[in-house]
Amino acid sequence: DGYAPIFAYIGTEGFLLDAELREGKQHSQKHTPEFLCELLHYGHKMTDKPLLVRLDSGNDSADNYGILLEDGSWFIVKRNPRTESKEEWAKHIKEWCKNPQTPREGKIVYIGTTWKDVTYTVEKNGQKEQKTIRMRIVYEMIERTIDKYGQILLMPEIELNMWWTNLGWSDADIIASYHAHGECEQYHSEIKTDMDVERLPSGKFKTNALVLDYPCIQHSQS
């Protein structure tokens, strides 16, 4: 199944903060809480400024929010709707959003905020305690009745994206900041191609994990 390494970058220049080699079959959230604690520790050693953590929908987990909230860090995490009905969300969003935008004929964009309770578990002095917090969800829903080529659609096409956050920024700034972290794909590419680790050399997982460490160190020094 190959490998699925996880990388964490800090700042705007692509400095690699932490990395971990994982088996391709491993779910993206497995062992992520431990990885998150580690990278927060490294981040606070590098700077005394507040940290903003951006995560993909594969890491939409109350465990992660608990760690980030207890740490005092900010976050933007792509929300995973799982089994929730897109149609039900669309119905509510049309009721909530007071200023939908129409960038062109047949395309309506709804942007706004709603709130939802999230319960997470913290462990103190060997005792587990549950905490519930009301968390912000920023949504962006695009409804298309005419596609970009002018073709009228038989049924409206709904595109829905949502993000968890504890920031007080505007909805538009939250969405823009999340999309900006797509630049990390460029850093992934540099490590894989420029440093020639597209294919790891060994049949042994631990050996490949060690091999990956070297280009990661070099990447942050270059």
Go through the PLM ranges and name each one:
Residues 2-5, 70-85:
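Acidic, His- and aromatic-enriched active-site or binding-groove loops in soluble protein domains
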